[in-house]
Amino acid sequence: MKTALLSIGDELLLGEVVDTNSARIAARLADEGIVTARKLTVGDDEGEIAGALEELARGHDVVIATGGLGPTDDDVTARAAARATGRRLVLNEEAMGHLREFFVRLGREMHPANGRQCLLPAKAELIPNPTGTASGFYLPLDRCLLMFLPGVPSEMAVMLDETVVPLVLERRGEHRRTRTLTLTVFGLSEAEIGARLSDLDRSRPGLTVAYCVEYPVVQVKLRATGEDEGALTALLEDGAALVRERLGGHVVAGDGETIDTTVARLFRETGMTLALAESCTGGLIAGRVTAIPGSSAYFFLSAVTYANDAKARLLGVPQGLLAETGAVSAEVAKAMARGARQLAGSDLALAVTGIAGPEGGSPDKPVGTVFIALADQAGCSAKGYHFRGDRDRIRTITAVTAMDWLRRRLLSH
């Protein structure tokens, strides 16, 4: 089965809105072993939409379109669908009934403009929308099934799962499934990972490997397709074991996890506690830690000590040390970590200090110079890094590197 996606909206072409709908639809179809062969994006132009529908219908079994089903003048998808299929645009009484019921539930009066959303191609079948005003619909164009969904992501997602996917599976008529297992890798480039895993899919028929860079990590996606659920699971687990063997400690998160949730799980399992002292990251690491529910069980405090005086007053970093080595140094990072641990009474304390830029660098300590330190009962260690990129990238990779320090320390507990 060949499927295609059509995203509709001027806001997509202008870069004002990111098209998350297509990604969600493609991923959901892939879970069922259906690969999206093509994707187009067009603006709110009736002729462009109709032309795209006709073009995609010629080479695909199913086309799923999103957007342009609202009540305003620029919502022209239904008219374009009628034009492409040679049908009249008529008032769909079933859609109107759903719309009236929706406003009754809200306790609000329906604006006359909303009635435009019920003008659909003749004999179109409805796709119910339980959370919004725009009904979806589907109809054939030659041998292709055209399906239309609203562009609001939350509405689209419900309609996709409840109606669209079952219809597509019914049309396919077979029961092959695709299962995906994702491992998160940090500290290796995509090229290095690919070289280490180059023979993985060739040595295991039915298994494919794909890579997705989400700076500063790389997602290694293992996919297996077949009819036997048990065989798919076994194939994926075998592939994942080999990835872990070849990439070692660079695999920082398993399927369904991130490096942040992995660290959270390890804190819960070990019963250890944490304090942070941040300078160049300005609380970014603490934000990642506290974004995970339940972090209050192990996270005590974070001191964002941007100024030297704050490092001295809050963390006890000696003024003489700051003057001698500068705030960006291994010695100061270690003093910050020890001070945070003493302040909080935690098992672990991690500190970062660095130059995120774009200003503040020097020949000896250019922009991107970062020191990370970790203190525990046994002592304190520190390491220097030189990260490249703009301010946001430097801060991001510093935070992820810090999370990896915590992950590795907790694994050694």
UniProtKB/Swiss-Prot annotation:
One Pfam family in the UniProt entry: MoCF_biosynth
Organism domain of life: Bacteria
InterPro entries in UniProt: CinA (IPR050101), CinA-like_C (IPR036653), CinA_C (IPR008136), CinA_KH (IPR041424), Competence-induced_CinA (IPR008135), MoaB/Mog-like_dom_sf (IPR036425), MoaB/Mog_dom (IPR001453)
CDD domains reported for this sequence: cinA (cd00885)
Similarity annotation: Belongs to the CinA family.
Name of the molecule in the record: CinA-like protein
Organism: Geobacter metallireducens (strain ATCC 53774 / DSM 7210 / GS-15)
